[in-house]
């Protein structure tokens, strides 16, 4: 470690725009966090997709794993060898390991940006592309190599058998008579095949003529059918007028049917409503009658109870006085006192009879009202029947004549 190395590292980081400001004094004492952040930044410059994170380093094991991964990535991507022990010290010795990578980055930035178009760079790119092409060809050949080797092995295994058969065939003497027979049979077969081919060609010509004739005949039939179809489309049958007339009549009959159906549905609904209202009136009338009778019964019981209470609760001297008074005035007025009692009883009977008459009159009024409602519903029903008769008359008028 020297002062020059520390100064060069600080200047390079400043020129490369390292996000943290560094000084020479930072490396006088061990500072692992600073070295880890600087190492992460350098690795990200060479490999942007690396997953190193200096902020997750907490323990000694994390430090060791971080240094190992960083050194391995630098070796794989830039062929730069670093000493992990010196990096772990995180002092001036770590600066010596970081300087080679920083120099590469600094030189890459210091180069002229127009050097990409120089002949030297073009030559390098051509060589690189040719090498890449060779690599692709090598990969293809390496994938074909096992298949070729297997095929070659199979052919070599059959070579011995084939060579034996070849030697046996070469050592055998072929008789001329037998060879002549084989050649004659081959010539005859070839002649037969030639004759068959010529016959097929002749048949093809005749078949072509027949097919042309069939095509012409089908065309004529097609044209005739087209003309006939056009005539049938333009022809109007005789029954169409009658059919249209019946169709119109059927529409009218359907309208009448729909009207009758709606009237019938309405009348059924009205009938159901009347029956329901009639039941409700009957129930209300019966309830009112029961309440009136119950009220009369309660009033009568109250009156009877009041009379009995007056009779039982009167004192004996009062009874004697009343009897004496009755005797005195009875002698003077005759039978008027008894007549008054009888008149009171008659009045009570008349009141009961009058209440019964009121209930009967109320019942008669309800019955009269019910009869009027029934007459009104019958009148509505007659109106519906009249409408239905009118619709039936219209139907009979429409259906008169030549109906279907």
Curated annotation (Swiss-Prot):
Expressed in which tissues: Expressed in a subset of sensory neurons including eight pairs of amphid neurons (ASE, ADF, ASG, ASH, ASI, ASJ, ASK and ADL), six inner labial neurons (IL2s) and two pairs of phasmid neurons (PHA and PHB).
UniProt keyword Coiled coil present: yes
Recorded coiled-coil stretches: 176-306
GO cellular component, one term: microtubule organizing center
Biased composition (Acidic residues): 337-351
Localization of this protein: Cell projection, Axon; Cell projection, Cilium; Cell projection, Dendrite
InterPro entries per record: Clusterin-associated_protein-1
Domain of life: Eukaryota
Pfam families xrefs: Cluap1
Region called Disordered, residue ranges: 328-382
Main function: Component of the intraflagellar transport (IFT) complex B required for transport of proteins in the motile cilium. May be required for ciliary entrance and transport of specific ciliary cargo proteins such as che-3 which are related to motility. Required for sensory cilia biogenesis.
UniProt family annotation: Belongs to the CLUAP1 family.
Subunit details: Component of the IFT complex B composed of at least che-2, che-13, dyf-1, dyf-3, dyf-6, dyf-11, dyf-13, ift-20, ift-74, ift-81, ifta-2, osm-1, osm-5 and osm-6.
Stated name of the protein: Clusterin-associated protein 1 homolog
Species this chain originates from: Caenorhabditis elegans
